[in-house]
Amino acid sequence: MADSERLSAPGCWLACTSFSRTKKGILLFAEIILCLVILICFSASTSAYSSLSVIEMIFAAVLFVFYMCDLHSKISFINWPWTDFFRSLIAAILYLITSIVVLVEGRGSSKIVAGVLGLLATLLFGYDAYITFPLKQQRHTAAPTDPTDGP
């Protein structure tokens, strides 16, 4: 039994890490890192805005783990494309609003850096929402128009 577990371990590791090399995996990892950097900048200046970064970092990390371990295919009662789309769309809108508020206040260099990084996060989350839009991915083939009956 130990031999079969040992033999399946590299395959399991390969399956788990193969998602991190995809476009979506790199995008989610970049979102996690950017949220962490924004959290550090907000914590250095004002902690009032840091909750957005914490929540979005947790959501992105949870989805990253679910996609990486292929848990999204095992949990079928959640519509994962729509969940990911709404997560990234709401994050883009909230980061845009928060960044504008922080840049208008503009007191302190860490707030300005956090505001600019928040605008960058808006673009990143907006791009994520664009590429994960579920209706864009569904392609329908045209129905045949030739008559099936003879001449």
Swiss-Prot record:
It holds the Pfam family MARVEL. It is a multi-pass membrane protein. One of its GO terms (molecular function) is chemokine binding. Residues 19-137 form the MARVEL domain. The chain crosses the membrane at residues 25-45, 48-68, 85-105, 112-132. One of its GO terms (cellular component) is membrane. It is found in: Membrane. Keywords: Membrane, Transmembrane, Transmembrane helix. May play a role in cell differentiation in the intestinal epithelium. This is Proteolipid protein 2. It comes from Rattus norvegicus.
